[in-house]
C-alpha cells in the first residue's frame, strides 16, 4: 500500500492504491518478451502517481511509459504497451480481462444499431465462440491495436467499444461466409468434419477458414471491408474507376455518381480525357468551351462538400491523356501561384500516357496536342491503332492542333511531379496490352492509388421521346429521324427533336437524354502478408481462402450506384495484393535489390498468381464463370505471364514454368473452361492494414528503421518489425536505395499480376535531378510497369520524422 494515495475506480469508488494489482498486469504485459522488465515499468510509472488518480489514468500512464521506451534497441516495449492497452479494452467491453460470448457481442451490437440483424442466426454461435483464439491478440503492436481501436472497432453512440479484436475478425469472417451453403464447396479431406446437410455447419466451416487467415495476420482485407463487414452499412469496396462523356448530361450524371461513391467512403479515379478543350466548339460555335479545368474545379468542390461520412474529405484522382489541348493547364492544377479559379488543390492529377508520347520524348520529337471534341476516338484506341490514328490527325489540315516539344512537356511533367508529388504517371499501352478482358472494352484510367486496371466506359446517351399519349420511343443522338412540323416533313438528328415535332402522327410531349451502357469499375481488395506467407506450401494453403473470401465480397457488398453493381457482377473483379515484403527480406537476411531478392519475389509471386488463377477457375466450376468470360483472354488459355514484358523476363535467371509444384499446362486447360473473376491481382498501398498487422507497408522498402506516427494520442514511436542485430542492416531505408532497383523489382512482380501495383519512388533532394528522374520513369515504362504513384522527396538531413499519411487513400489501405 502507498499511504495517502487513493485510486478512483470505474464505478466511482475510492480505494487505496494497491501496487500488487498493478503488478499483476505489468508482469503479464512483459511476460515472454526480451529486453523489457515490469519493475522498470512500475518504477517509471509510479513517479507519476498522485492521490485521486483514476484507474483509467493509471492505465494511460503505464501505456505512455511503455510507449516512451520504444526504440531501435528496445522494440519489445511495443508489445508491452499493446498488452496494457488490450487489458484496458477487455475491461471496457466485458468488465473483466477476457472475452464474453459471441452471442452477447452480437446482441449488444444489434441493440446499438451497429451490427446487421439476422447475421448471427445463420451460424452455430456456440461452435464459433469456442473457435475464437484470444491469444492471437498478443500479435498486436501498440500502434497496431491502437489503429484497430481508432478505425475499426465498432462503438456505440456514446463512443464506447462493443467488440474485441477477435470478435471483430470473426464478425467479418461470418459476414463474408454467410452465402456459403453448397456442400460441394467442402474439400474431400474435411467432409467428415462438417454436417453437409446443415447450412449452418457449412457456413461455419468457411467462417473459421476466413477467421483463421485474418486473425493470424496471414491475409488482411482492405479498410472498407474490415470496417463495414458485419455492420448495417456493408459498403466493402475500396475504390471506383469511371469515365466521363463530353456532354452536359454525362458530366452532371458523373458528378452525382462521384458524390454518392464519395459519401460512402470510396476513393475515386475518373477519366476526363473526352472533355473538349478550352476554346472548342459548342453547338458549332467556335471558342465557346471553357475546357476541362472548370469541370475539374467543380469536381474539387464535390470532393470537399461530400466528405466521407464526416470523417475526411473525398479523394478523387483525375486523369487525362497528354495529347489533350489543356495538358499544360492540367499540370498547373495544384500550383499555389496563378489564377486561383483555375486551380484544384484537393484533387490528385494523373496522366494516362500512350507509348507514342514516350517514343517522341526519346527521339526528341514534336508532340501534337488536340481537342478531344475533334479527336475523341483516340480515347478508344491503344497501341498501333492509336498511333496510326494519331499520326493521321497530325497530318490533317482541318483539325485544331498545337505542336510542342515532347521532351519539354516531359520535363514539365517531371518537375511538377518532383515539386508536388503529382501527376501520377500511368502507361496506357502497358495497361491495355495486358488486359485480360480486352474483348469487352478498354482501360481508360486507373484508380486513386494507381493499382487498379479494369475496363470502364462513359455513359452513352439515347434520346427518349415521350408522346402526349404516354407512349415512348428511343433514338440515338445521331439517328436521322423523320418528323413533321405542321404540314412540313423534315429529317433531323435524334438530338434535335423538340416538343414542337410530330413523329408518325404523334405529338411529342417531352424529350430527354437517358444514359445507357456505362461501366464504373470497382476495387475489392485484400493483401497477403509475405512475412507469414512465403513458402509454396503456405501460399497454396492461404491464397485459395483469400480468393474465395474476396469473391464473396462482390455478392455481399452494398453498392451506392447501380452502374457499379452491374459492372462488378459482369466482370467479378477482385484485387489480391501483398504486404510485408521488406520484413520478409530482413528476416531472411536478404538485401533489398539483390539477385536473391529478385529471385525470391519472382518465385513467391509466381505461386500467388498460380493459386489465385487456379482457385478462380475452381470457383467457376462450383459457382459459375463471370458473365463476360467468353471471348476473354482467359477463355483462350492466355494467362497474365503470357503477355509479360520481354525485358522484365530477363531480370531474373529462372526457367519459367519449370518448378514442379506449379502445373501451368493443366491450369491453362482448366482456365479455358471458366474463371470466376475477370480480374484477380492488384497490389494496393496497405498503409493502415500493414500497421494493424505489424508488418511493413505493401511491397516497398521501409522509409526509416524508426519513425513517428501521429494519431489522436499524439506521436507514437514506431520501429520496423522484428528489429534485431540480425535484421538491422537488411532494413535498408527507401531513400538510401537506387530507385531503379525498386522499378526492377516491380517489373518482376508485374509479370505475374493481371492488374497493377501502387508503386512509390523515394528521392532525397541531394540526388534529385531531371536526368535521374527520367531514367527511373523511362525504365519503368520500358520494363512494362503500368503506373507510378507518389514521388516522395525529403532532405538527406532528416533523421527521424513524423510519417505523413494525409496523402494516402484510406480505402485502399
Task: Describe every region a protein language model picked out.
Residues 39-51, 55, 277-316, 512-522, ...:
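A structural-propensity feature for long, helix-poor, extended segments
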Residues 119-129, 133-147, 453-454, 550, ...:
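Catalytic alpha/beta core of large soluble enzyme barrels
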Residues 88, 92-135, 237-517, 521-527, ...:
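Active-site cavity-forming subdomains of large catalytic enzyme subunits
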Residues 1-3, 13, 36-175, 179-211:
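Core nucleic-acid recognition elements
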Residues 92-97, 136-304:
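Long, structured ligand/cofactor-binding scaffold of large enzymes
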Residues 44-45, 63-66, 81-87, 213, ...:
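A glycine-rich phosphate-binding loop feature that marks nucleotide/adenosyl-phosphate handling sites
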Residues 213-216, 222-224, 543-565, 591-686, ...:
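Internal maturation/activation junctions in enzymes
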Residues 53, 68, 140-155, 214-227, ...:
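Core structural elements
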